[in-house]
Amino acid sequence: MNSTKGRTTIDVGTDGVAIITIINPPVNSLSLDVLNSLKESYDQALRRDDVKAIVVTGAQRKFSGGFDISAFGKIQGGTVAAPKPGFVSMEILCDTVAAARKPSVAAIDGLALGGGLEVAMGCHARISTPNAQLGLPELQLGVIPGFGGTQALPRLVGLAKALEMMLTSKPVKGQAALSLGLVDAIASSKELVNTARHWALDILERKRPWINSFYRTDKLEPLGEAREILNFARAQTRKRAPNLKHPLVCIDVIEEGIVSGPRAGLLKEAEAFQGLLHSDTCKSLVHIFFAQRGTTKVPGVSDLGLKPRRINKVAILGGGLMGSGIATALILSGYSVILKEVNDKFLQAGIDRVKANLKSRVKKGNMSQEKYEKTLSLLKGALDYESFRDVDMVIEAVIENVSLKQQIFLDLEKFCTPHCILASNTSTIDLNLIGEKTKSQDRIIGAHFFSPAHVMPLLEIVRTPKTSPQVIVDLLDVGKKIKKTPVVVGNCTGFAVNRMFFPYTQAALLLVERGTDIYQIDRVITKFGMPMGPFRLCDLVGFGVAIATGGQFVLNFPERTYKSMLIPLMQEDKRSGETTRRGFYVYDEKRKANPDPEIKKYVEKAREIAGVTIDPKLTKLSDKDIVEMIFFPVVNEACRVLNEGIAVKAADLDISSVMGMGFPPYRGGIMFWADTLGSKYICSRLEEWSNLYGGFFKPCSYLAQQAAKGAPLSLSVDQAKARL
């Protein structure tokens, strides 16, 4: 077979054990070539008289990361023929591997995810290293396990645990897999294949059980109990993911196998997988999967052959919520951190916040006490710059004050080495302004974390025209090491995420002042898939932040900002959101939000100040209209961000909207979702509202041009006028 394609090799030892090795770097994914080769290798091993038993393993200490996801898009687009339904699950795994007259053992190191674990479950036994990861994460991509996993996993670990593993997509490590019965023994990487060889021969000699996973029943709960478990799982799934169909399909397929037998279950699995593969949800989630992995491809940066420099020590200026969160993220990934504050009281408060962040992990069972102590030892406090002389990067996270930040960057130049990266976590101030008094503007960069910084997955890396590509490469590497998805954006008010979403709340305010109910808007937007509606979000971030951020947009984009007095009026009355337990909602002792009838008087006053009246049409909007009137202005601003080159590509805006604002990933991100509706439709609706309600809704020139051509709003990298 062509060595550039994925393949398997077969090597027969003197003991009569054939070692079949999956080779498809970097994670030995199961491409169609690999699957066909696996079938050929198995057929050969079963034909050969010198082969007594079989061990399946993966090259480079990785079993298999699962089905090749890049093939999904090709199959969806019709450029590659899909394997016939059931080819892998029935023809290869059930009828060839599991039914073979020669025993098979899977030797698992590194990863056995998705199709990789399904291949392993087709074998008669599994040996794993202690830290190998085993799981079925297919639901994250909008499909179900399609190589027999829905039938084999419940029979190996029991129905309740199998449902949990599939519905949460969370893998287990080798040691935990042993206690569940998913693997039969643990071995070191060095001894793994040898242990598997001996195990396979022991099965042949009947010293160990010869088990066909598909027909095992001893781990399955009695039918009545199984139905109860399945019904409970359905109820929980409908509650947690009301917009998603595929988790319920997964439960149905599992049930079919339990009630009607594994063969019926495999047939239903194959049919369901085929249908889900072509669903909008799957297309959206596959797009997000690749968008997340594509953020580090930045023209003029990642294509220069630059290697990231080693960052050992990082200093954080400011121990507030953001600074302490950034410090937590860094020490959790093994970086030495200096946290600087202006006095002992503030410094101790910052260190205490970091401790609290770590202690919550201990409390949840995600960190041992020993690991807590070791991680905390990486943090040191400081009140001056003396200890900054050997730091590799500084991240400034002080209050949003231009002159203060300018002075800090001047001081940093005096104390830090010439190679030290000077980063700011500002979310509103122009980076050029912050660094204008410094001599070395090539090492100034934005590192915009989202709060809480140790939890939120996105990191906006903001570059100015003077920022060195090397500094960007360095920060991309740090972002990945601290388990963030780093997105490189240009320098502008709000950068990418905050700028895209500034019309989100403004559109909601416009609707409310013209008669739409506040709580209806929040209900509809939450039903659409957002974590919360715009008014609940305002309460969460606080009115002070909302007014300050809004002020930046009024200043920079006056012609398209909707100016409402609703929030300032409420703040005057000491309503500031969740912190004061009164905002758009009232909050009880447990911080539960409840609608507040008093809000009407503020809305009426804001309406009077704005000089607008209730529009009867806006008092009875459909859910669809509310979603479009809230999100189409966001799409409009995203088009500007893309056209101005603030973002390199539309996919970066998609992943940013998902990770920065909670846009539902199963809709593919803001631009992907917009393209499913069409530029013509979006433009026509914006024009209609612009005529009725003013310039806030006016389509930008880029959106209008794409609509006139009937072209999608997403641009490829080489089309983008990257003003980075």
Go through each PLM region and give its residues.
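Conserved CoA-thioester-binding segment of acyl-CoA-metabolizing enzymes
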Residues: M1-A59, A81, D95
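N-terminal glycine-rich phosphate-binding loop for ADP-containing cofactors
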Residues: S3-T8, I23, K74-T79, G86-S89, ...
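Conserved catalytic cysteine-centered active-site region
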Residues: C94-A106, G110
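His/Asp/Glu-rich metal-coordinating catalytic cores
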Residues: E118
